[in-house]
């Protein structure tokens, strides 16, 4: 994820990793942000 205004937090809706806040990635199957291991 990226540090930008409006980034999505854990379990926030997303389409791609860049929609999520830092250390989060978009889980394609559920279309929500989750911890990416960083």
Swiss-Prot record:
Chain positions of site Responsible for the inhibition of BgNaV1 fast inactivation: 37-38
UniProt-listed Pfam families: Toxin_12
GO cellular component: extracellular region
SUPFAM superfamilies: omega toxin-like
First-listed, main subcellular location of the protein, grouped into a coarse class: secreted
Compartment(s) of residence: Secreted
Note: Possibly exists in two forms, due to cis-trans isomerization of Pro-5 or Pro-22.
Name the record gives this protein: Mu/omega-theraphotoxin-Mb1a
